[in-house]
From Swiss-Prot:
Cysteines paired by S-S bonds: C51-C63, C55-C71, C62-C75
Keywords: Amidation, Cleavage on pair of basic residues, Disulfide bond, Knottin, Neurotoxin, Secreted, Signal, Toxin
Domain comment as written in the entry: The presence of a 'disulfide through disulfide knot' structurally defines this protein as a knottin. The cysteine framework is VI/VII (C-C-CC-C-C).
Protein name: Conotoxin ArMSGL-0141
Distribution of this protein across tissues and organs: Expressed by the venom duct.
Major subcellular site: secreted
A GO MF term: toxin activity
Residues spanning the signal sequence: 1-18
Cell compartment(s), UniProt: Secreted
Gene Ontology cellular-component annotations: extracellular region
PTM sites of type Phenylalanine amide: F76
Family according to the record: Belongs to the conotoxin O3 superfamily.
Organism: Conus arenatus
Length: 77
């Protein structure tokens, strides 16, 4: 095989390796994002459940405000 053919094959191999490594990194980042979203949802759900339970004792509604969930006789907005 000529030197030019070997050079072309080497370049193709390098390009393939670089793109497959990049794809693996993107896949890993996507999986990490999915895990973070699940954690965030479970935390939000837990806070909402705690708010509802504590407000239920006071016979009020759990309302989301800028400062987080709070108990109020009636939620606005």
């Amino acid at each position: 095989m000529s030197g030019l053919g070997i050079l072309v094959l080497t370049l193709l191999l390098l390009v393939y390796m670089a793109t497959s490594h990049q794809d693996a990194g993107e896949k890993q980042a996507t999986q990490r994002d999915a895990i973070n979203v699940r954690r965030r949802r479970s935390l939000t759900r837990r806070v909402a459940e705690e708010c509802e339970e504590s407000c239920e004792d006071e016979e009020k509604h759990c309302c989301n405000t800028n400062n987080g969930p709070s108990c109020a006789p009636q939620c606005f907005g």
